[in-house]
Amino acid sequence: MKFSQIELEQAIQSIPYIQNLSALYFSQEQVSFEITFDFEELDKPIDFNIIIDQAYPLKISDSESIRFYLKDDEYKQFSHVMLNNAICFHNQHCITFHKKLQQDFQAIKQWIVKYIINLEKDEHYEHLITENCTYKETYFSFQFTDVDESFSQNEIGIVTNTFLTKSKYKDKDMYHYLVQSFTHNMTQRNCQWSSFYSNKENNLSGIYVFIGKRPSIYDRFSFSNWQEFKSLFNQEMLSEIWKITFSIQQKYIPIFIGYNTKNQDIHWQVAMIDLKDQFFKNTQGIYELCDKKINWVISKNSSYHYFFGRGAFHPNLTDKKVLIIGLGAIGSQVAKTLVRGGCKNITIADYDVKEPENICRSEYNFLPPYTNKTDELAGILWSISPFVELSSIRHLATEYIKFDLPSECLNFLSEQFSEFDYIFDCSTDDDLMYRTGKLSLTSTIFNLSITNHAKALVCGISPNHYRFVKHQFDNILENDTLDLYNPIGCWNPTFKASYNDIAIMVQLSLRTINLMIQENNYQNFTIQYDDNLNLKVERF
């Protein structure tokens, strides 16, 4: 321990609202003792068991290394009390034992005042505290989204699920499923995944029961035994569940318990049930819930607004159709960032193939060493977001546009390009930039180019993007055209810059573009380093 028993006793005795230090056990691995909180505002004292781990006063992972356990179960009704009666709290960093101990005891006193004395409620919604169990020594997870239609009280139906992947979770295997639909009679409510995911095969059926009310104790803890559902599952409901279980030819079935949250969302808690060992029995048409533990598994509302709730681009970008031309160092990073930023409809275009030397500064993987850039990047983008509608083209946007075409073909190309709201031209192809400048487009083009060694980035915006970019490279910026990287063989030389160099420029340019879209104020701009390596965005 980083403190002695005497230091601990003296520190506790110095806290005026702490009494009755007893049952003290002190070792180098762990310390435990009992104390009482007692101060003027309390109707009666509150007793605690306390355990301190040897890392104290430092945290262990993201948890405090001191734990306060309430001795009386009556306090489980209050916020932030866990199933084991421990109070969940997070305190400030402190490396001084005496100061940290006072700080932690003060945090518990503040919790008592706020929740027990003043009976305050947290405004933000919290899910029920649930023990996530294994089924047959395996963990399960189910991802779902909001659906457009509502559910009726006590409605029962079929859930279809798609297997996603298998992973390690803690020390066991975990199987991950995507919820596809909820079907009752002839009404099917579909989760709002992209077509790439919604078109996948359904390979696990389940049952859903919408009860409306949270299946909880103190409105905080999930039921842990099936008999606790007695007041929520009537005979008619159990009869319907019984019939459905026999129509599903599986060894196990997930059962989804649905209820309304105070945010007016619907949450689904999922339990795994074994058809050979049901959670209720049928005795001559009379159904009775068994005294059995509920095997709750992980379920998550991964709707778009939660999935991107921690940060996304402006809706005027994410809700629009986007075309990205050129999927090299710049374009692949642009594509990946836009998808992580919540963009829902993206088309990627590149005629080229990925080779091993492309990987070090792009968003591609080593395996397979050779493949079409559009094909590999599409797979990467789908693995990031289950909401992006993605398509790809290889030649139209990069080659056909350069042909000597009659006016009707140029009009056709203009119509094709104008289907997009925003076009990110990351090809660094001057010929392509010139041709897009000659088309009559309703879309906005952002042409992104980087100088050698990534000392500057230029963003030209239509309709004058060609003129602006050429002027910057030919007359304004310093661009070393001699010290280039020459691949082995007969290839065009390319600029020198690391992944880090390029990413800094790309991320700042996308931040600037997102802001311009939000403000509806489009200006050409450059990004350059000054003499002190500070980046400066200059608009024109």
Regions found by a protein language model. Name each.
Residues 119, 137-282, 415-422, 426-540:
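Glycine-rich phosphate/adenylate-binding loop
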Residues 384-411:
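S-adenosyl-L-methionine
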Residues 351-393:
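Glycine-rich phosphate-binding loop and adjoining beta1-alpha1-beta2 segment
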Residues 266-322:
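N-terminal charged helix/coil linker that caps or initiates catalytic domains
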Residues 12-91, 98-102:
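Compact alpha/beta protein-protein interaction domains typified by the UBC
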Residues 326, 350, 394-397, 426-428, ...:
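Active-site proximal loops enriched in glycine and acidic residues that flank catalytic Cys/His/Asp
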Residues 64-159:
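Domain-scale recognition of soluble eukaryotic interaction modules
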Residues 312-353:
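Glycine-rich adenosine-cofactor-binding loop
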